[in-house]
Amino acid sequence: MTRRSPPSTFHAPGMARSTTMRYTKMSRTATSVRWRTMAPSSPTCSHKSRLEWISLRIVDQPTPRDRMVQVVRWYLSSYHAGRKSQVAKKPYNPILGELFRCYWEMEDASQHGDKTEVGEGPVPWCSPDQLSFVAEQVSHHPPISAFYAEHVNKRIQFDAWLWTKSKFLGLSIGVHNIGKGTVTLLDVGEEYTLTFPNGYGRSILTVPWIELGGSVSIECIQSGHKANIEFLTKPFYGGKKHRVTCEIFAGSDKKAYYTAQGEWNTRVDGRWTESGRSEVLFEVSNMKPRRKRVLPVSRQASNESRRVWRHVTCALRAADCDGATAAKRAVEQTQRDEAKLRLASGERWNTQVT
């Protein structure tokens, strides 16, 4: 079987070519994901949490059915509720060209594994046994973020782009997540294309809470397998929060060979239709978060998230909201000034990751 390399150019539909995220000499990998509310953090940085609960076991599954179920397990488990924080919070609006890089040590990596730096890719200083990740804000109007991750030795990769549109809905705020992601298994030549649910901030004037809602799909063109997932919003009267259901089909089959249901922030149970065997697809309480590895701020480039927002972060940790506001405005004013200079000179914006 011919081994497939990832595309050298990543392009989100609707983006000008000047806002294209490009990757060169990549022939590697990536996997897991998890939505989390993070503070203090820029959204460009926080999307990396989708990769925090890694399921590299996708590549170890023997059949297309097993691999699709494993992709669904990873996808659904990645949305569970995130870190609690007692510090003051201030929203960070990612600036154009902002980058975030990190990597994770994997549990299944050999203690004496290959520690040679890969020398290229999202995080050139990590090893082939580690999962690396990079995110870039590739457009400001509209706000589009692009992401890429890979695990060299497992030969699995993940790339995605996301554009959010917000709308007030009375006492709620709705966030429409426009975009898609692709999990690529290089050795078996399979690509799993997925979409994202919408988010809702409820009871914004009293005790706010967040839920997901809408239909999403995960599809593998090569194997013909497809998962239809429904994130169910809570009814106005009664009902449970955070419900999710899933059906997985093979080819043109009318009957799902695997179904799942539960609460995405606690536990989801699955069932194999043919055998009737039931299983716990995932349980959040058994999931151990992994600590991401990031360069010290002093060694980061000027456009990397933690360096861009360092003064805002310091103010938030000191519970100084006025200081955080001033620092945030300074960052945003610099962005506006740079945009005016580009407009005056006719310069087109080029993405940073090449």
Task: Map each language-model feature to its residues.
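Extended acidic, Ser/Thr- and Pro-enriched interaction/regulatory segments
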Residues: 1-56, 60, 65-354
